[in-house]
């Protein structure tokens, strides 16, 4: 059966001498793995449209096993601005990897697709220090892990909140402090990201507070996934 959908390429890997398996997150079917036949040939009909990060309109044939077959792919956005910047490529790769690890085949999640699309667009528009950390926090919140930020996660005290602990699930007061010490600026940025002021947070210039938020976001994502994010190492080197 043929079907149409809209997807973003998360990753690809070789199959045989000329084909590739393409892993998409799609708007209508969630995570999909499909074979692109002949895509590695010089004169492939797909050209470069099925590279990681590509936003494409797809026609696929639904396979009987685990793999569908890509029959058509038309580019919607190739995110050229990101591809021309090594730092942006590294940041985008960490977003793709997080979604790839988070998404499950057969689980339809239009919000996950839209969140990744929005994250890539934000990264293309401006490469601020909080684009990827904000994406991680929003993705974790979508999956049900939303840190407690308005009061101590242990005793409920409203403050001052001076630490963040992953096992506690959020911020902690001075009496219950453990985990990572956080400044008032970090607390403010976390609240902005998850409290409806994302635009303002994304415009923040680089500072020690944005670096701390980035480290916390990476640790929280890896804690949730129970694995290291390989692309974060690349990001550290970019």
What residues fall within each predicted segment?
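Non-catalytic alpha-helical scaffolds and adjoining flexible linkers that form interface surfaces
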Residues: 1-238
């Amino acid at each position: 059966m043929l079907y149409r959908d809209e997807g973003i390429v998360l990753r690809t890997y070789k199959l045989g001498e000329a084909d590739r398996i393409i892993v998409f997150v799609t708007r209508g079917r969630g995570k999909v793995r499909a074979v692109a036949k002949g895509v590695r040939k010089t004169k492939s009909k797909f050209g470069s449209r099925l590279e990681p990060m590509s936003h494409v309109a797809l026609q696929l044939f639904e396979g009987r096993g685990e793999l569908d077959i890509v029959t058509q792919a038309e580019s919607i956005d190739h995110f050229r601005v990101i591809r021309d910047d090594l730092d942006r490529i590294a940041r985008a790769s960490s977003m793709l990897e997080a979604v790839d690890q988070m998404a499950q085949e057969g689980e339809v999640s239009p919000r996950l697709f839209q969140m990744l699309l929005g994250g890539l667009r934000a990264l293309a528009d401006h490469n601020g220090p909080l684009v990827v950390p904000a994406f991680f926090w929003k993705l974790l919140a979508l999956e049900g892990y939303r840190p407690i930020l308005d009061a101590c996660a242990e005793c409920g005290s409203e403050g001052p909140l001076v630490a963040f602990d992953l096992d506690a699930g959020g911020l902690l007061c001075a009496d219950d402090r453990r985990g990572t010490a956080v400044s008032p600026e970090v607390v403010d940025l976390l609240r902005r990201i998850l409290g409806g002021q994302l635009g303002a947070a994304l415009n923040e210039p680089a500072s020690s507070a944005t670096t701390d938020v980035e480290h916390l976001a990476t640790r929280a994502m890896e804690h949730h996934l129970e694995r290291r994010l390989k692309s974060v190492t690349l990001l550290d080197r970019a």
